[in-house]
């Protein structure tokens, strides 16, 4: 599904921006549930992202090529060592002696600037898949359909939620 969406974005860009050198990279945020890799008792959201990316300025991509990019990027980044390194980087910045004594309002402003430079704005869309949802048998007869809607971030306005229930996948 991620590859199909990336291909569609490339085709839209090709229509809207005929000059290849003016096209932008196509990057999708794919959330990864870290609870499956790292046991945690927290009830907070414990996730990171895998970010498959292609650059249309380098030429046209076939659907198979995009599928390979997504497949290999997922395999590379969705690894406990790689995710552990991302977590360690975040934790190390929190433990910095300078940042620990810095007033919160300054930290918040700095984090906003950093997030704007490297956060979700650097992607085209976020594709989040809850997977197959199972309901208790007593509840199932009362449910006709299951949907998953992602909140719209301030900078990256395109999101897609996917959920499967009762043999049907809703996008």
Question: Where are the regions a protein language model picked out?
Answer:
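Short amphipathic alpha-helical segments
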Residues: 1-5
């Amino acid at each position: 599904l991620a590859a199909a969406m990336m291909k569609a974005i490339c085709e839209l860009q090709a229509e809207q921006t005929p000059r290849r050198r003016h096209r932008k990279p196509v990057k999708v945020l794919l959330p990864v549930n870290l609870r499956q890799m790292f046991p945690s008792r927290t009830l907070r959201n414990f996730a990171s992202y895998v970010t498959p990316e292609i650059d249309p300025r380098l030429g046209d991509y076939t659907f198979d090529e995009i599928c390979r990019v997504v497949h290999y990027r997922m395999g590379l980044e969705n690894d406990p060592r790689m995710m552990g390194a991302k977590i360690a980087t975040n934790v190390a910045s929190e433990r910095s002696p300078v940042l620990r004594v810095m007033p919160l309002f300054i930290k918040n402003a700095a984090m906003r600037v950093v997030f704007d430079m490297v956060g979700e704005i650097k992607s085209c869309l976020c594709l989040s898949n809850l997977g197959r949802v199972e309901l208790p048998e007593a509840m199932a007869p009362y449910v006709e359909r299951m949907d998953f809607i992602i909140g719209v971030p301030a900078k990256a306005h395109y999101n897609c939620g996917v959920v499967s229930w009762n043999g049907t996948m809703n996008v």
